[in-house]
Regions:
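Non-cysteine beta-strand/loop elements that form the S-adenosyl-L-methionine
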Residues: 108-116
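Substrate-recognition "cap/lid" segment bordering the active-site pocket of phosphatases
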Residues: 121-134
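Conserved N-terminal beta1-alpha1 strand-loop-helix module at the mouth
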Residues: 1-109, 131, 135-144, 151-163, ...
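A short acidic, helix-capping loop that chelates divalent metal ions and anchors anionic groups
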Residues: 26, 63, 116-122
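Short Gly/Pro-enriched loop/turn and capping motifs at secondary-structure junctions
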Residues: 115-118, 150-153
Length: 186
């Protein structure tokens, strides 16, 4: 769970997998379920070959159709109970302690952030910073995966703040440098 690479194409997934990502999260925003499935088949196969967890972002039906290992749901997404009924890994997003505590009642892990400002999600909440991340990590009993503005220069800070791992979008192609920084912090 140390390095989640959020990807929207097979090439980025391949680079992330070869660089040491431990989870590939298939993230296609505003795309119909059948297209998520069709475009995700090759990435699912890549994950199986590399022994990596394959998680689908936001779309429970696509995850089930792809035989995914898990689903990550945002705060406004539905389907958490269905994910659990099917025995899949469930990640839920949270931007604060109260939200994380509520999510942790059902989730296998909590995605916390944004830690720092990020251009990958223009409508993101205000950054929680390392102190907010630390508070959130202490407040829940499930692993916390930090997200938002994370790259090789600051990933280790998230681990030192208590996160079990980090999730990246822009830095997914830099997985090798991220993994080296994370391994050094562990």
């Amino acid at each position: 769970m140390i390095l989640h690479a959020l990807v929207a194409d097979l090439d980025t997934a391949r680079v992330a997998a070869e660089g040491g990502a431990t989870v590939i999260q298939w993230r296609l925003k505003d795309v119909p379920t059948l297209e998520v499935v069709e475009r995700g088949r090759s990435t699912r196969s890549l994950c199986a070959r590399h022994g990596l967890a394959f998680v689908v972002n936001d779309d429970v039906e696509a995850a089930l159709m792809l035989g995914a290992d898990g689903v990550h749901l945002g705060r406004s997404d539905e389907g958490a109970e269905r994910v659990k009924e099917h025995g899949l890994l469930l990640g839920l997003s949270a931007a604060g302690v109260a939200e994380a505590q509520a999510a942790a009642q059902l989730a296998d892990y909590v995605g916390a952030g944004p830690v720092w400002a990020t251009p990958s999600k223009p409508d993101a909440d205000p950054p929680i910073g390392l102190e907010g991340l630390r508070d959130l990590c202490v407040a829940v009993a499930v692993p916390v995966v930090a997200i938002g503005g994370i790259d090789a220069s600051n990933a280790a800070d998230c681990i030192r703040a208590g996160a079990a791992g980090v999730a990246v979008i822009r830095a997914a192609r830099d997985a090798a440098a991220l993994r080296a920084a994370l391994d050094a912090a562990l």
